[in-house]
């Protein structure tokens, strides 16, 4: 039994992969030590996507055509998961993401699964928390380069607006380095809180 693991072992978001990779390796070692599944041992094929969507697609295609994996664990981040989820569905290869929260990763796909909550769940919960804290206005600072950030921002904005909060929106991209002008704009509108739905 071959299981492919597609994850960012290196790059900007590699810290998210450590727990996933080590967790998979630990469980596979445990299963194999107990005799495998129906007497068959599990072989892991682990590849580094570097957190890049196109690299994840290339790895997925190789794992299916050359490595002949039976299951994919990954991707870790939403953008790369979105890039391979449709491929998994078409190939009818089960894919499980431990941490991709974008709703569209699994939507309408019966071969794609997640073991975590979704962007709407997080965004709504955060907006409700802002209401509980009795904030009247919140600035949302969104990284438009990230599917994760955009999904969370939209869910937060929808719920916070329903709850009567005033929303101030500012956007940036992953390449931005100077936030002085954006933060000056936000400061000028005097929000009671700032919501930054992004990777740390």
Task: Go through each PLM region and give its residues.
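Loop/turn elements at helix/coil->beta-strand transitions in domains of secreted/extracellular proteins
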Residues: 1, 39-43, 66-71, 90-94, ...
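Second-shell loop/turn segments in exported
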Residues: 9-15, 46-49, 69-71, 110-116, ...
């Amino acid at each position: 039994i071959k299981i492919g693991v597609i994850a960012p072992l290196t790059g900007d978001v590699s810290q998210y992969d450590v727990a996933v990779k080590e967790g998979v390796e630990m469980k596979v070692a445990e299963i194999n030590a107990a005799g495998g599944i129906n007497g068959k041992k599990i072989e892991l094929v682990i590849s580094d996507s570097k957190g890049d969507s196109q690299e994840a697609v290339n790895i997925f295609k190789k794992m299916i055509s050359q490595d002949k994996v039976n299951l994919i664990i990954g991707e870790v981040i939403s953008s790369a998961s979105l890039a391979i989820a449709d491929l998994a569905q078409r190939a009818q290869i089960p894919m499980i993401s431990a941490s991709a929260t974008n709703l569209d990763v699994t939507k309408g796909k019966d071969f794609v699964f997640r073991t975590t909550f979704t962007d709407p769940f997080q965004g709504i919960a955060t907006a409700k928390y802002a209401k509980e804290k009795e904030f009247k206005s919140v600035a949302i600072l969104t990284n438009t380069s990230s599917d994760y950030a955009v999904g969370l921002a939209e869910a937060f904005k929808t719920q916070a607006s329903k709850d009567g909060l005033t929303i101030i929106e500012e956007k940036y991209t992953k390449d931005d380095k100077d936030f002085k002008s954006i933060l000056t704009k936000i400061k000028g509108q005097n929000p009671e809180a700032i919501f930054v739905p992004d990777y740390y």
